[in-house]
């Protein structure tokens, strides 16, 4: 017997929140998440009151339980110690794409996004089935980075929608100065520095 415009009252955490029945016999009432978390019984109690043409008042009630999980996941991330064989970017590597690799753990999941920040730019990749990642970073950006440090982060979301982030950083060196070899010829190419007919 509920009618459009009847008042619906929700009770959560000892507080009441009201709304009206809509034309399609539904209702939608905003409840602060903080009150849902704080409610001791984790139960929403609902009631509706309606009055008929004769002035009789009727009330209906219902309740619905729910769960709370506000604990963020804790992913971890580790960058491999050397980004090249010797952990030094040389002049050749400065012109290449350098694969930066590492592993994740904790609550990190396959498919989570890993973000590397180098030279103020971000480069992203996904966690693979073996909990590793490999992300190409231009050697030029590794050379240009003022701190010569790769900053890595991973973000993961649990089943309840909580978001957790893990971070790590790894330094490296740059040497793009070409070696300068020297060579000298002996002053005399023969004993007297003269090529004769025999020589």
Question: Can you describe what each PLM-predicted range is?
Answer:
Residues 1-199:
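Extracellular glycosylation-rich, acidic/polar low-complexity regions of adhesion-
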């Amino acid at each position: 017997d509920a009618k459009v415009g009847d008042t619906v009252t929700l009770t959560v955490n000892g507080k009441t929140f009201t709304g009206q029945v809509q034309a399609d016999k539904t209702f939608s009432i905003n409840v602060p998440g903080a009150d849902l978390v704080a409610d001791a019984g984790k139960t929403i109690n609902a009631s509706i009151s309606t009055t008929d043409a004769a002035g009789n008042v009727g009330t209906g009630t219902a309740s619905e339980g729910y769960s709370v999980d506000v604990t963020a996941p804790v992913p971890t991330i580790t960058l491999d110690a050397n980004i090249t064989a010797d952990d030094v970017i040389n002049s050749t590597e400065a012109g290449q794409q350098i694969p930066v690799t590492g592993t994740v753990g904790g609550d990190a999941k396959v498919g989570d996004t890993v973000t590397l920040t180098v030279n103020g730019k971000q480069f992203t990749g996904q966690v693979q089935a073996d909990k590793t990642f490999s992300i190409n970073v231009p050697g030029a950006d590794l050379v240009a980075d003022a701190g010569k440090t790769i900053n890595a982060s991973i973000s993961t979301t649990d089943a309840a929608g909580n978001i957790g982030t893990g971070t790590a950083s790894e330094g490296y060196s740059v040497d793009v100065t070409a070696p300068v070899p020297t060579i000298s010829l002996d002053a005399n190419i023969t004993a007297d520095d003269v090529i004769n007919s025999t020589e």
